[in-house]
Design a protein with these regions (language model features):
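N-terminal auxiliary segments of SAM/dcSAM-dependent transferases
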Residues: 1-35
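Class I SAM-dependent transferase core
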Residues: 32-60
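Membrane-proximal envelope and lipid/glycan-remodeling enzymes
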Residues: 16-19, 23, 43, 154-157, ...
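S-adenosylmethionine/decaboxylated-SAM
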Residues: 10, 51-255
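Intrinsically disordered, low-complexity segments enriched in polar/charged residues with Gly/Pro
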Residues: 1, 38, 44-45, 165, ...
Length: 255
């Protein structure tokens, strides 16, 4: 696809297999086309590697963080489980939402929590709401520790952001989906992988070996979940869909 943006005429010109067309800026399709290109360019220049949340690096798109906040506010979980810790920014993000609500704990799981990251997380003022568990998120013994940390929480929200291979994410979906309460969400991050094949820091098999492919297989075998983004709590826009690193990654448990 070839895209040309004419700011004087306020149009986006698109040339693809179906021909050429000019889309006015006022058409939601123009926003969709430009957003997809922006996501790809952002990947190439590592746009998400420049944000922090309350002092800790958080490698997420700002829009994705806002949508997570909306979902947590709406579902009011007693416990939030995140696989993939890295610098701990997302853990602190979730813990800050719990702190504002005056309710909830956060459990972070990673196969390796580097000492400097652990020290920074443990020194953070929100650490009392966080439990760190080091181990393979798909190992039975690790999952048991997570389940113990969640305890008797009635409302549980799960965010999967560790190893992004299809098989690993599928195993996580099967395991951690059992923790999610009815009405809450199971989120598989980084399904954008299939859209950035050929970009820097990618692998040739990402078109099939990615979290989105795991979600498809999981939904085919599991009828307690549906693919469904949280409802917009406020939306006076003409925008269709989301500008996200995990399109199609929101799963709501319906029973």
């Amino acid at each position: 696809m070839i895209i040309r943006i004419d700011t004087d005429a306020a149009t986006v010109h698109v040339q693809d297999g179906s021909g050429s067309r000019a889309i006015p800026f006022s058409d939601p399709e123009a926003f969709t086309v430009v957003s997809k290109a922006w996501l790809r360019v952002g990947w190439d220049v590592k746009d998400v590697y420049r944000f922090t949340w309350l002092g800790r690096p958080v490698i997420q798109l700002p829009e994705d963080l806002v949508r997570l906040q909306e979902a947590v506010f709406a579902t009011k979980p007693d416990a939030i489980v995140e696989t993939g810790v890295a610098h701990g920014g997302s853990l602190v993000f979730f813990a800050s939402l719990c702190e504002l609500a005056g309710h909830g704990v956060v459990v972070g799981v990673d196969i390796e929590i580097r000492p400097h990251n652990r020290a920074a997380i443990e020194a953070h003022p929100l650490f009392p709401r966080i439990t760190l568990i080091e181990g393979d998120s798909t190992a039975a013994e690790t999952f048991e520790r997570v389940r113990d940390a969640v305890g008797r929480a009635e409302r549980v929200f799960v965010f999967l952001d560790s190893n992004h291979t299809k098989q690993h994410v599928l195993q996580e979906l099967r395991l951690y989906g059992s923790l999610v309460s009815a009405g809450s969400y199971l989120v598989a991050a980084d399904s954008i992988m299939s859209d950035v094949v050929g970009a820097p820091r990618t692998q040739p098999d990402w078109d099939v070996n990615n979290p989105g492919a795991a979600v498809e297989e999981f939904l085919a075998e599991e009828d307690r979940f549906v693919r469904e983004e949280p409802p917009r709590l406020f939306d006076e826009s003409h925008v269709e869909g989301s500008v996200s690193y995990w399109p199609g990654g929101w799963l709501r448990r319906i029973r």
